[in-house]
Amino acid sequence: MPRRTVVVLSATLALLAPGYASAASPGPDRTGRAEAVQPPWRPAPGTTWQWQLDGKVDQSVDAAVYDIDGFENSAAVVASLHAKGRKVICYVSAGSWENFRPDAAAFPASVKGRSNGWAGEKWLDIRQLAVLEPLLGKRFDMCRDKGFDAVEPDLLDGYTNRTGFPLTAADQLAFNRMVAALAHERGMGVALKNDVEQTADLVDDFDFAVNEECAQYSECAALTPFTKAGKAVLHVEYALPTGKFCAQTRKLGFSSMQKHLNLDAWRKPC
């Protein structure tokens, strides 16, 4: 939706290193040869897209990529979009607990913080990597099993918000790199959602960016490391009309559009 640890030291230091991969990452097989890994899907700058999290997915929208709710949509919806030549992104929250999701009871009270401003949601203590990794892994399993091409993990910028936990920039880097590794282990691409301040640190770990309102907050230039690396920036504005941002974001190579705040099917692309 739109919105602006207890771990041993050695594990935390490993996570802070670029290119972190968890113990489940592919490695040498029993013969000592490295296992072949299919490169994750990576949208190119300028790719057209649709982002719909509210209501039944309107599959008639002319866009190369659809970003839709991973829980609310079935494998049949993903397959139908694939049959139309679309790539499909699985929206899930990574940084918040949601009381309306089927796995809500699996999250212990110790990781739940303050409300993030949305009904039924609370920030997560992203320092607790050992607790959150298997929970998020199961969500990403769902995305993979439904056939999604990539994941949009929401709320990867908790350290800049009032979460109820003393989160640091280093905590966020460690968590975000873990999230990226979980997607890659499952053969899916992964988006850096917002977290503009850490773009330069994370561009090598993520396959594309999803951003809300960089024009509104004069932050779009900070996202150019993605387009310079040949990776799409999928961008929306809510309050600004297209005439206020399209000229700028076209020059930057972004995939920009105006959307309603509830992210229904309506869109006005640049």
Task: Cite the ranges covered by each PLM segment.
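Glycan-processing catalytic domains of CAZymes
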Residues: 4, 9, 29-270
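Secretory targeting and sorting signals
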Residues: 1-26
